[in-house]
């Protein structure tokens, strides 16, 4: 497809809308610039040929008009000279030029339309390229900030997840400690009760040696004698 065949696409292109839809505006802004500069080069190359065609069509159209006027003028002179036969020939020639003039007029209109479209495409591309060049650094800077923020958000989410895990671990530890305390209490309740009387009897149990008993009896006897 020739560049002029892309007139509607180029003229309807909306740079802002294209960038808004792009997943990575930083990369796409460079791609769009390359594409538009390529289109601009094609427009410039083809514009010269289209404008030359416009000038040629316009020149041929005016030349045909001039020839028709000339044939009519010759016919009038022939009639004035009393030569109707020559006048008829000049008028026949004028009639044939009329059909040619219609064709040249149509070709001239097409060439003029093509030239106008090429100029519009040229101006649109120059304008879009200028706008994109002016916004390129800002777009890249904003994209870098957005990606940095995205990484920070992911890091924050990871830290939050870790905190939640630690909190869950703490709750688990409390649950284990509670279960252990309950088990210890139950074990204490299930242990055999202490026999208080047995302990008291053991306190006064004469489990000492017979020598001690003999010495105690001798001491008592001595105390009786001293009285």
Swiss-Prot record:
Q: What induces or represses its expression, per the UniProt entry?
A: By cold shock (at protein level). Expression is sigma W-dependent; induced by alkali stress and by infection with phage SPP1.
Checking Pfam families in the record gives: PspA_IM30
Task: Show the InterPro entries listed in the entry.
Answer: PspA_VIPP1
Q: Which UniProt keywords apply?
A: Coiled coil, Stress response
Residue span of region Disordered: 191-211
Reading the lineage from the top rank, the first entry is Bacteria
Reply yes or no: does the keyword Coiled coil apply: yes
Name the coiled-coil region(s). Answer: 33-125
Family named by the database record: Belongs to the PspA/Vipp/IM30 family.
Under which name does UniProt file this protein? Phage shock protein A homolog
């Amino acid at each position: 497809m020739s560049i002029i065949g892309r007139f509607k696409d180029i003229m309807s292109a909306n740079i802002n809308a294209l960038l808004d839809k792009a997943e990575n505006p930083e990369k796409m802004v460079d791609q769009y610039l390359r594409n538009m500069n390529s289109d601009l080069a094609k427009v410039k190359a083809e514009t010269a040929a289209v404008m030359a065609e416009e000038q040629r069509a316009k020149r041929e159209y005016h030349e045909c008009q001039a020839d028709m006027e000339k044939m009519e003028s010759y016919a009038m002179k022939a009639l004035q000279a009393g030569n109707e036969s020559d006048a008829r020939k000049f008028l026949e020639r004028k009639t044939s030029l009329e059909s040619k003039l219609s064709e040249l007029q149509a070709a001239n209109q097409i060439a003029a339309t093509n030239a106008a479209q090429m100029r519009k495409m040229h101006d649109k591309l120059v304008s879009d390229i200028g706008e994109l060049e002016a916004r390129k650094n800002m777009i890249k800077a904003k994209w870098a900030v957005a990606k940095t923020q995205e990484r920070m958000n992911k890091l924050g989410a990871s830290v939050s997840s870790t905190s939640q895990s630690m909190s869950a671990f703490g709750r688990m530890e409390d649950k284990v400690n509670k279960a252990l305390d309950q088990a210890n209490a139950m074990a204490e309740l299930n242990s055999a009760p202490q026999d208080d009387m047995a302990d008291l009897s053991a306190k006064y149990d004469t489990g000492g040696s017979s020598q001690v008993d003999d010495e105690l009896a001798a001491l008592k006897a001595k105390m009786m004698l001293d009285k």
